[in-house]
């Protein structure tokens, strides 16, 4: 168990009528009950989910049980706090508020204005940003819309962008396209050129990136990853951007919690725009943020006139009204709660533990003979290359899923198939939120190794992926092996506490 305490809210929700100093809602008053009479037998909106929709309630309980008894290793997942979940499931879901604080297209927005401004302030505080030099838009629904909004603000249709290639650890929204098709909207609306890893080192090839940028002349270079286990050299990318007169956008979706905790380098010193999700290492509700530079960009050497940044109005207009309608006020409030948590010493301790756990996981895998892309990790994840073992990520993912270990198949450099890629991506944030330490992650690697060995045995007896999956379920000996491993995994996992609500 962790030596430090994860203080999640444990008190049960109180009904509105129990809140001291607040007016009792009219439908709870005696007069309202008298007026409604028999109508009270109709819809009131006060029924619990378990009473109103037992079928959905049972599905939620099953998912909660799956999370409690399993080992969650998907690098982009985490366990949100009860406090943030309470905000997410609040009355804020009811309020429509197109526009921005003080400039809404709907009335009754006084409170949500305060909530959005509070979220903005906390976002800047979480990353130690001067409000005179940085602003933030907290309305993006998630990371992909945040990226598209940033591109829309900075670029014209068919302008050129560069991002890390998806098989090398990039993200779909960084301009991904295959040899035969434009996959992401960011490659449909803009002309994209990927940069790649050095195949010998597994690290971003900055020299080749610079050479490609000189030839391609992009308007925007994206510094961000989804399956890259090393730190990004933002200073080097800034140099490239300055040389080719491109904007630098840092997508820190995976690492924003680590940046806020100051346990890895920050992109803010070098980037023009920074985007992020809020539910990964930041451990909040699902949403997105766009940070942008403001203030003085330069001084005209001839006239001495200050030249300001123009990102603020462009970013805000791109989010609304260009791409979105009303913001999700419940999500903004939940993000604000998580951002407050991210400013605490406890969160820094948590983030340091993520790095320790990821390192322990990487070392344990190497000791067992596994190959890791780039040879290790500097952040919250490891990318295992299973090809030297003779297995692929799709088969490994399915075996692990059957023993209550959740991971995801992932492309490795040189992969040609997204259906059966050679990699398996493993992340430390979620289990660290449950209190796992280094020794616990070493045990987790032991379970993974057992699962991979089962997969290798079954692969030797089958051909196609579908045959492999069917054999896992139908072969008695294999089923017995899986059941035994699953029982040990679940017994191990249930011993650790789970953030959030107790029953859903």
From Swiss-Prot:
Chain positions with N6-acetyllysine modification: 103, 181, 196, 356, 464, 469, 474
Regulation: Hydroxymethyltransferase is inhibited by succinylation at Lys-280.
Subcellular location: Mitochondrion; Mitochondrion matrix, Mitochondrion nucleoid; Mitochondrion inner membrane; Cytoplasm
PTM info: Succinylation at Lys-280 inhibits the hydroxymethyltransferase activity. Desuccinylation by SIRT5 restores the activity, leading to promote cell proliferation.
Transit peptide feature, positions: 1-29
Superkingdom of the organism of origin: Eukaryota
Keywords associated with the record: Acetylation, Cytoplasm, Membrane, Mitochondrion, Mitochondrion inner membrane, Mitochondrion nucleoid, Nucleus, One-carbon metabolism, Phosphoprotein, Pyridoxal phosphate, Transferase, Transit peptide
GO molecular function, a single term: glycine hydroxymethyltransferase activity
Gene3D superfamilies documented for this protein: Aspartate Aminotransferase, domain 1, Type I PLP-dependent aspartate aminotransferase-like (Major domain)
Protein role: Catalyzes the cleavage of serine to glycine accompanied with the production of 5,10-methylenetetrahydrofolate, an essential intermediate for purine biosynthesis. Serine provides the major source of folate one-carbon in cells by catalyzing the transfer of one carbon from serine to tetrahydrofolate. Contributes to the de novo mitochondrial thymidylate biosynthesis pathway via its role in glycine and tetrahydrofolate metabolism: thymidylate biosynthesis is required to prevent uracil accumulation in mtDNA.
Protein family membership: Belongs to the SHMT family.
Protein name in UniProt: Serine hydroxymethyltransferase, mitochondrial
Lineage: Eukaryota, Metazoa, Chordata, Craniata, Vertebrata
Chain's gene name: SHMT2
């Amino acid at each position: 168990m962790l030596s430090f305490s994860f203080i999640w809210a444990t008190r049960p929700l109180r009904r509105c009528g129990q809140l001291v100093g607040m007016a009792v809602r009219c439908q709870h008053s005696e007069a309202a009950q008298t007026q409604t009479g028999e109508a009270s037998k109709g819809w009131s909106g006060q029924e619990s989910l378990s009473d109103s929709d037992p079928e959905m309630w049972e599905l939620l309980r099953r998912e909660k049980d799956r999370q409690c008894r399993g080992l969650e290793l998907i690098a982009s997942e985490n366990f949100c706090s009860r406090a943030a979940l309470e905000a997410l499931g609040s009355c804020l879901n009811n309020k429509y508020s197109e526009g921005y604080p003080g400039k809404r297209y709907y009335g009754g927005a006084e409170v949500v204005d305060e909530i959005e401004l509070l979220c903005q302030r906390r976002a800047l505080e979480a990353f130690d940003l001067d409000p005179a030099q940085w602003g933030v838009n907290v309305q993006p629904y998630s990371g992909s819309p945040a990226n598209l909004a940033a591109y829309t603000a900075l670029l014209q249709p068919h302008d050129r962008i560069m991002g890390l290639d998806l098989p090398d650890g990039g993200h779909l929204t960084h301009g991904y396209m295959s040899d035969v098709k434009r996959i992401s909207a960011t490659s449909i609306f803009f002309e994209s050129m990927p940069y790649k890893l050095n195949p010998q080192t597994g690290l971003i090839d900055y020299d080749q990136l610079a050479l490609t940028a000189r030839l391609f002349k992009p308007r925007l270079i994206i510094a961000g990853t989804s399956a890259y286990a090393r730190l990004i050299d933002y200073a080097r990318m800034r140099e490239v951007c300055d040389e080719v007169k491109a904007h630098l956008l840092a997508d820190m979706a995976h690492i924003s919690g680590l940046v806020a905790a100051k346990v890895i380098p920050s992109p803010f010193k070098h980037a023009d725009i920074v985007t992020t999700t809020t539910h990964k290492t930041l451990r909040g509700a699902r949403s997105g943020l766009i940070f942008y530079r403001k203030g003085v960009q330069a001084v005209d050497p001839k006239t001495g006139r200050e030249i300001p940044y123009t990102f603020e109005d462009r970013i805000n207009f791109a989010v609304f009204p260009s791409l979105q309608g009303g913001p999700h006020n419940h999500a903004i409030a939940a993000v604000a709660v998580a951002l407050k948590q991210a400013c605490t010493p406890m969160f820094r301790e948590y983030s340091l533990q993520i790095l320790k756990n990821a390192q322990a996981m990487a070392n344990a895998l190497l000791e067992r003979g596994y190959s890791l892309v780039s040879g290790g990790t500097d952040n919250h994840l490891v990318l295992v290359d299973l090809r030297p073992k003779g297995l692929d990520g799709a088969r490994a993912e399915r075996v692990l899923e059957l023993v209550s270990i959740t991971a995801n198949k992932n492309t490795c450099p040189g992969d040609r198939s997204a259906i059966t890629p050679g990699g398996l991506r493993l992340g430390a944030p979620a289990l660290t939120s449950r209190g796992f330490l280094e020794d616990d992650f070493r045990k987790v690697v032991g379970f993974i190794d057992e699962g991979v060995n089962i997969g290798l045995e079954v692969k030797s007896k089958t051909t196609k992926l579908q045959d492999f999956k069917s054999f896992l379920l139908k072969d008695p000996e294999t089923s017995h092996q899986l059941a035994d491993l699953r029982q040990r995994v679940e017994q191990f996992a249930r011993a650790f506490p789970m953030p959030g609500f107790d029953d859903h």
